[in-house]
Structures are given as C-alpha cells and as structure tokens.
A protein has these predicted regions:
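N-terminal export signals
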Residues: 4-26
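Short, acidic/polar
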Residues: 47-60, 125-136, 226-234, 262
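Catalytic domains of carbohydrate-active enzymes, especially glycoside hydrolases
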Residues: 54-73, 142
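Glycine-rich, proline-tolerant flexible connector loops at the mouths of alpha/beta enzymes
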Residues: 69-94, 150-154
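Acidic/histidine-rich catalytic cores of soluble enzymes
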Residues: 67-68, 164-267
Length: 304
C-alpha cells in the first residue's frame, strides 16, 4: 500500500472512530513515547569481550529499559557469534532471552551486507538478497523494524534511483516489517535527499530512522567536513519515521546533552505525531557506556 492510499483510508477511518494505526500494522504503542536501547551503546564492551551479544536483553533490563535495538555487526564483524551459531539458532536464542527478561525486540540495524545504492546491478541485487535474509531473521525475532544503509554511489541522481529500486523491492518482500533508512553518512545525511527517496518509494512500511546526530555528509562526526543542520534534518525525516535514534555524546552538570538540544529534538518528534520508541544511542568517550546510557535515559525521561 502506498502513502497516498494510506492517507485516503486514514481519513476514512476517522468516520468510524479508528486511528490509522488501528487499521494497519503499525506498532500498538501507548499514547506516549517509550525508551529503547540501541545495542551500539554497548559496542565497546561487546567488542572487548566484556559483554556477550546474547546477554543484551539482560543488560537492557538492568537499566529498566524494556525495548532493544540489535546491531547485526555485533554478531558478525565484531564477534564470532554467528560463526558459532546459524542464523536460526541465533534468532531462537535471542528470542528466548528477550522473552525471559520481558523485553520487546524493537528493531535490528543491518550493516556490512552490501551496497543497496550501487549502480552495479549484480552488486546491488546481491545486497538485496543479503538483506532479505536479515528481514527473515528480524521477523523471527519479532522485530517491527529493520534499519539499513544506502551506500555505493557518489552521483546523487543515480544514488536516488538505485535507492528507490532497492527499498521498493525490500519493502514489498514482506509487509509485516518496516524497512527504514537512517541518516548515516553521505547523501543519506541530507534530510532533503533522503526524504525525496521516501517520497519516490511511497510504500507505507518503508520509512526513516531519524538520528539526532548523524548528519555529517562528508567525514566522521568527530572530523566532519560538511554538516547538515540536524534539527532541519530530523524535521524533514520525521514524516516518514518508524523509529527514532537519540544520539548522545556528553552531558553537563545539569544532565543536559551539550552537543544536541534535546528539548528541541523531542519537540520536533512530538510535533510530528510520532508515538513509538526512542532509542538511546550513547557514543561518548567521557562517561562509561553504562553511565552514558543512564544519563541519556534520565534526560529522555524528563522530556517525553
């Protein structure tokens, strides 16, 4: 179903007293924002072997956080868990542990599975196949959303066309999961460019994951040559959002994030009518990972 038809049926739903989210397969959230934990917040501990990726649900519960966002690379590139276990066995074990601790498997972030925006058709189709395997994995976990990246092309027009093709295929592959793109470097960190891709795909389960901090178009966040305005970017991406990432780096003595105006960001999120999870993604170097997660959680709790 495309967005135009969704809008028509959403309007119709008002006559029978139902919200669009009660008609379609949108998450059945309470009427407020909820806090989840992105696994990347714990990437240092996992890479160092101090925390097993299998214990993510347990760790999240220790913070009093009931929703989790997996990162595929922490089971492949940065650990050997997937070498030891098949994808089926890994998903079974993660699902069991999340159920044991009463944790919602919110989404999974997919990295390193090929260039979905490549102009090399063979390469792009291979990337699509790789991501389809992870869609199956995510569905088995009960995730409502899968996040992917749009890499592989430096020409904007070609990047846009290739991205639309790949996203359309993956969104149609299984309508029971949201396929979303995060602003994650390159053209995707330009809110206008990524919103244009979404407009062209026009499929209801295809959308965005606006990240409060990932708006560096050239370079890295700590050494960036070209920043896109993060508040403008989040505002442009929120109409398509199926998830939101609360990036954080450093906090002052009052508990406020020093690089991002969190109140302004949360106001943008609320104004868009978003009712889902907001995922903590701490990437700072001053506080420990645990301390950064707690600080971000406290700040979000004040604002949501």
């Amino acid at each position: 179903m495309n967005r135009r038809n969704f809008s028509k049926l959403a309007a119709l739903s008002s006559f029978v007293g139902l919200a669009p989210s009660q008609i379609f397969s949108s998450p059945n959230y309470d009427d407020h924002l909820k806090i989840s934990l992105a696994q990347w917040s714990l990437n240092k501990a996992i890479k160092a072997g101090q925390l097993s990726g299998l214990d993510f649900a347990k760790k999240s519960r220790s913070f009093g956080i009931e929703g989790i966002e997996y990162v595929s690379g922490l089971y492949t590139t940065h650990s050997n868990l997937l070498e030891k276990m098949s994808m089926n066995k890994l998903s079974d074990e993660l699902l069991k542990r999340s159920n044991d601790y009463g944790i919602d498997n919110v989404l999974i972030m997919i990295d390193g599975q090929g260039n979905l925006a490549s102009s090399n058709k063979k390469e792009r189709l291979e990337a699509i196949d790789n991501h389809m395997r992870w869609i199956d994995f995510a569905l088995k976990l009960g995730c409502e959303t899968l996040r992917l990246n749009l890499n592989g092309e430096k020409n904007l027009d070609k990047w846009t066309d290739n991205s639309v093709k790949s996203l359309s295929t993956l969104s149609e592959y299984n309508k029971n999961i949201n396929v979303v793109v995060e602003n994650h470097g390159g053209f995707s960190s330009n809110g206008k460019y990524l919103a244009n891709v979404m407009s062209n795909v026009d499929i209801i389960n295809c959308g965005t994951l606006p990240d409060f901090g990932n708006f560096c178009m050239d370079g890295s966040p700590r050494n960036c040559n070209n920043w896109y305005d993060k508040y403008k970017g989040v505002e442009e991406l929120m109409p398509y959002a199926h998830a939101v990432s609360a990036k954080s780096y450093h906090f002052d003595e009052n508990g406020d994030e020093t690089t991002i105006d969190y109140k302004k960001m949360i106001d943008i999120v609320k104004k868009a009518g978003y009712k889902g999870y907001v995922g903590i993604e701490y990437e700072g170097n001053i506080l420990s990972e645990d301390e950064g997660i707690v600080a971000t959680k406290k700040l979000l709790e004040k604002l949501i």
